[in-house]
Curated annotation (Swiss-Prot):
Annotated stretches, region: Disordered: 40-76
Factors inducing expression: Expressed specifically during appressorium formation.
Naturally occurring in which organism (per UniProt): Pyricularia oryzae (strain 70-15 / ATCC MYA-4617 / FGSC 8958)
Recorded coiled-coil stretches: none
Protein name in UniProt: Appressoria-specific virulence factor GAS1
GO cellular component, one term: cytoplasm
Amino acid sequence: MSLKSLIAATILAAPLVAGHGAIIKAVGDAGGEGMGLGVVTSTPRDGTRRDPFQQDSTRFKGQQADTFGETVGGGQNDVESMTKAIMAETGSQLPQISPGGSLQMTLHQVNGDGAGPYTCELNDDASGAQWQQIRVTTTPPGRNSRNRDGAMTDFPLVAEIPQRQACTGTVAGQTNVCLVRCMNAARAGPFGGVVAAQLAGSQTPQAARRALAESVKRSELIVSGLKKRGYNIADLSQEEIDELRRDGEIA
């Protein structure tokens, strides 16, 4: 099964919502490269309409307010499968961050209410269960999350990593992973994104690639096994998927 097919099989559909800002690139102070969960790099960036320009922008609303958000095009953001897809596309390690360093992001503002100011939070175990506020040193401009002049524009968004920060999560075979979640306060949103980042020095680039390949292969085997046993992942509820993950049935 291809990586794209695997992603399609493991992400649930969700009610469609519009999003107006997307983190299209993220780089750590020590290198690496990534982007926000759910971002599709083929999405055109020269318009403001819902289709196709808002399809991969994340919104945190309702049941998704305290999670990883959702997009119009992909539904609920899934950390594991989407991180695999991001690494496969960039061919790079995740953004490499240092305690006391920074995560440097590019925020594409789609339309007027994708504007700043943005706030950022960090989750140290990649579960998304608990978030701590971190300092934003550079934010897209705006007042009350509105700025019509900023539509269709890329802006820098920089968040500081706290001193002595530890990261303990494992995602897509990558160890020592933290999640950084940034959003504005738009009434129709909030809009923003979630970026997976890794403590610098955790894995060599070669080890990171091997771990990613092993993780993808393991997921393919698990999906194949579930199909043989009569499971259709796309038909399962989020609670059922979470239970399968806890039982080690899926990655």
